[in-house]
UniProtKB/Swiss-Prot annotation:
<dbReference type="InterPro" id="IPR012340">
    <property type="entry name" value="NA-bd_OB-fold"/>
</dbReference>
<comment type="function">
    <text>DNA ligase that catalyzes the formation of phosphodiester linkages between 5'-phosphoryl and 3'-hydroxyl groups in double-stranded DNA using NAD as a coenzyme and as the energy source for the reaction. It is essential for DNA replication and repair of damaged DNA.</text>
</comment>
<feature type="binding site">
    <location>
        <begin position="35"/>
        <end position="39"/>
    </location>
    <ligand>
        <name>NAD(+)</name>
    </ligand>
</feature>
<dbReference type="GO" id="GO:0046872">
    <property type="term" value="F:metal ion binding"/>
</dbReference>
<dbReference type="InterPro" id="IPR033136">
    <property type="entry name" value="DNA_ligase_CS"/>
</dbReference>
<keyword id="KW-0520">NAD</keyword>
<dbReference type="InterPro" id="IPR041663">
    <property type="entry name" value="DisA/LigA_HHH"/>
</dbReference>
<feature type="binding site">
    <location>
        <position position="414"/>
    </location>
    <ligand>
        <name>Zn(2+)</name>
    </ligand>
</feature>
<feature type="binding site">
    <location>
        <begin position="84"/>
        <end position="85"/>
    </location>
    <ligand>
        <name>NAD(+)</name>
    </ligand>
</feature>
<dbReference type="GO" id="GO:0006281">
    <property type="term" value="P:DNA repair"/>
</dbReference>
<dbReference type="InterPro" id="IPR001357">
    <property type="entry name" value="BRCT_dom"/>
</dbReference>
<keyword id="KW-0464">Manganese</keyword>
<dbReference type="Pfam" id="PF00533">
    <property type="entry name" value="BRCT"/>
</dbReference>
<dbReference type="InterPro" id="IPR018239">
    <property type="entry name" value="DNA_ligase_AS"/>
</dbReference>
<feature type="domain" description="BRCT">
    <location>
        <begin position="592"/>
        <end position="670"/>
    </location>
</feature>
<keyword id="KW-0862">Zinc</keyword>
<dbReference type="InterPro" id="IPR003583">
    <property type="entry name" value="Hlx-hairpin-Hlx_DNA-bd_motif"/>
</dbReference>
Length: 670
């Protein structure tokens, strides 16, 4: 049926008016019509689109709701990792952050920072192509998140189409999804009346709402989105400053939190912090601190990143909320590396909306310094508003029979000896990979993606294998039989075959991956590559003295001692030999010959045709180079694949050498 021109014009007019009212309500906080009038406009548009379905477009305001439930969330790879921020908890830490930046930039005078509230919600990435929302993804582990596009489309403050026409060809807008306090209280009241599950706090409510498999449920939750950062950007140059990015957001219809302020120097940041400490309760949603960012994007690019956080930003957390309760018992947990940690079992108490019944005492030095005993009345707080910890006892309330806790002489799990080296705060079980507590975590680590990458061997299955005594040590992974696996609940023939295929595939690995998989304390994937590159053979590494290990660049005395102790423990040596006997193998690491890659730092952006990102990084490391995830002035080359991200733009701005895949492969052969 042909749509009359008059009707088409009215539909377009209604869409424009509704989008404009959304913009005024969510971005400008200046609504110009009552809700009832807005509802009338929306219902009129719905009726017209129902009568003329050929007029419906994906970006129409009516298309926020109505998608069918999903079976599972698809994974999304973040081209630019969604990194978290480092935290500081006092003025001293904040001043140290400022000092590090100025020293790195060789600046004496203060420079501009942008201060903003640290929203206590869920990080979200919005991808817009030619102004239209095409994908929304959660942070996940920072590298891989979940596709929550259908759910995000139901959030009224997220524009399905950016305003105006001055937006780039492709832009990734990062921000936070929140549930305002008022909406949270109302939701819990109504859920309680229905006898449904309630949420402990607004953050849990926002996270649970965003990850509903049925978008129609998300649509009923009072969620709001605020943008705070650009990830990918194509078809437009970055502006000069971060505050200019926020102005872009407002122009495009992306809500930006109003309490953002540009300040001169660290003193301005401290003033902003003090102001927000006093006014945080007046805000419509929960915040747990402030975020401080260098305003200049050029300076941000120069500073770059360290590990999993940017150097140019920091989170200054508010003092944690505190409550009193009683210590019922002090028990001991054993971690993957054998650390024996005292944990207080508490009379349950609500702190910041979360019921706390366990709290860490960190280590035995902390336990004795605080002098916490069973029976004590203690102050409990959520450190950084997240992790429960015991601040200390109230001595005036201490009962006469309060018991002082001693370091256990034996591991509570495997009964091996527990030792506490002089000068160290942590006591450790020496049972190694034979300790059941360490075994559970060690298998999870051993089979993880960056280690031997055994697909399908998840946490629950590991627990089940240990519980059923199918795996008694880490070598048991390679001795699993199909008949034993299929006898387990919910494990059919196909599942068993897939798992055994993945286990067999994992036998062929690399020396760096194998070293990382062993879970040696202090040996991450970077240190594992360093060790493999230096020794080339496992036997040489296992025989190395502490002095030899300390001669290697980036291996300090503590790491050297841990590596030496691990390989000189009889149980571990036997386990390694057994793994090799069971077929775990790798190509011998070749000594690095002089090449154009040796000593150079590389960053990859975009997809390569002939190699995965991990394969390319491994080849760089084997050739004596270094692969990093972010561009800085210390980067030598940026390898540009298909559909490069903003790393490409940053590299151009810093004058860093750009090479394509063909040039990179030639360098590898050099």
């Amino acid at each position: 049926m042909e749509v009359p021109a008059k009707i088409q014009k009215r539909i377009e007019r209604l869409r424009h008016e509704i989008n404009d009212h959304n913009y005024r309500y969510y971005v400008l906080s200046q609504p110009t019509i009552p809700d009832s009038v807005y509802d009338e406009l929306f219902h009129e548009l719905e009726k017209l689109e129902k009568k003329y379905p050929e007029t419906i477009t994906p970006s129409s305001p009516t298309q926020r709701v109505g998608a069918e439930p999903l079976k599972v969330f698809e994974p999304v790879h973040h081209e630019i990792p969604m990194l978290s921020l480092d935290n500081v908890f006092d003025e001293k830490g904040l001043r140290a952050f400022d000092k590090r930046i100025r020293q790195r930039l060789k600046l004496d005078k203060p420079f501009e920072y942008v201060c903003e509230p640290k929203m206590d919600g869920v990080a979200l990435s919005l991808l817009y192509e030619n102004g239209e929302l095409i994908r929304a993804a959660t942070r996940g582990d920072g590298y891989t998140g979940e596709n929550v596009t259908q759910n995000t489309r139901t959030i009224a403050s997220v524009p399905l189409q950016l305003r105006g026409n001055d937006y780039p060809e492709l832009v990734e807008i990062r921000g936070e999804v929140l549930m305002p306090r008022e909406g949270f209280a109302k939701f819990n009241r109504e859920a309680e009346k229905r006898g449904d599950k309630t949420f402990a706090n607004p953050r849990n409510a926002a996270s649970g709402s965003l990850r509903q498999l049925d978008p129609r449920i998300t649509a009923k939750r009072p969620l709001i989105f605020y943008g705070y950062l650009i990830g990918l950007l194509k078809g437009k140059d970055f502006p000069k400053n971060h505050c200019d990015v926020l102005k872009w957001f407002k122009d495009w219809g992306i809500p930006v939190i109003s309490e953002i302020k540009v300040v001169g120097g660290i003193e301005g940041c401290l003033d902003y912090y003090e102001h927000l400490v006093k006014t945080r309760e007046k805000m419509p949603f929960d915040i747990d601190g402030i975020v401080i960012k260098v305003n200049s994007l050029q300076v941000q690019a120069e500073l770059g990143f360290v590990s999993r956080a940017p150097r140019w930003a920091i989170a200054y957390k508010f003092p944690a909320q505190e409550k009193m309760t009683v210590v019922k018992a002090i028990e001991f947990q054993v971690g993957r590396t054998g650390a024996v940690t005292p944990v207080a079992r508490l009379e349950p108490v609500s702190v910041s909306g979360v019921t706390v019944s366990n709290a860490t005492l960190h280590n035995f030095d902390e336990l004795y310094r605080k002098d916490v005993r069973v029976g004590d009345t203690v102050i409990v707080r959520r450190a950084g508003d997240v992790i429960p910890e015991v601040v200390g006892p109230i001595l005036a309330k201490r009962p006469k029979k309060a018991k002082l806790i001693k370091i256990p002489s034996r591991c509570p799990v495997c009964h091996a000896e527990v030792i506490k080296p002089e000068g160290e705060a942590v006591a450790r079980c020496v049972g190694g990979l034979y300790c059941r507590a360490q075994l559970r975590e060690s298998i999870k680590h051993f089979s993880s993606r960056r280690a031997l990458d055994i697909e399908g061997l998840g946490d629950k299955l590991v627990e089940l294998f240990i519980q059923e005594k199918l795996i008694k040590d880490i070598t048991g992974i390679y001795q699993l039989k199909k008949s034993a696996i299929t006898a387990l609940p919910r494990m059919g023939e196909k599942s068993a075959e897939n798992l055994l295929t993945a286990i067999e595939k994992s036998k062929k690995t690399t020396l760096p991956r194998f070293l990382y998989a062993l879970g040696i304390r202090g040996v991450g994937d970077t240190t594992a590559r360093t060790l493999a590159r230096h020794f080339h053979e496992l036997d040489l590494l296992m025989k190395a003295s502490i002095e030899t290990l300390q001669e290697i660049r980036d291996i300090g005395p503590v790491a050297a001692e841990n590596i030496h102790a691990f390989f000189h423990q009889k149980n571990n040596a036997e386990l390694i030999n057994k793994l090799i006997h069971l077929g775990v193998h790798w190509p011998q690491e070749k000594a690095v010959v002089k090449s154009e890659i040796a000593g150079k730092t590389f960053v990859l952006t975009g997809a390569l045709k002939s190699l995965t990102r991990e394969e390319a990084e491994e080849k760089i490391e084997r050739s004596g180079g270094k692969a990093t995830s972010s561009v800085s002035k210390n980067t030598d080359y940026v390898i540009v694949g298909e559909n490069p991200g903003s790393k490409y733009e940053k590299a151009k701005a810093l004058g860093i050498s750009l090479i394509d895949e063909e040039a990179f492969l030639k360098l590898l052969k050099s």
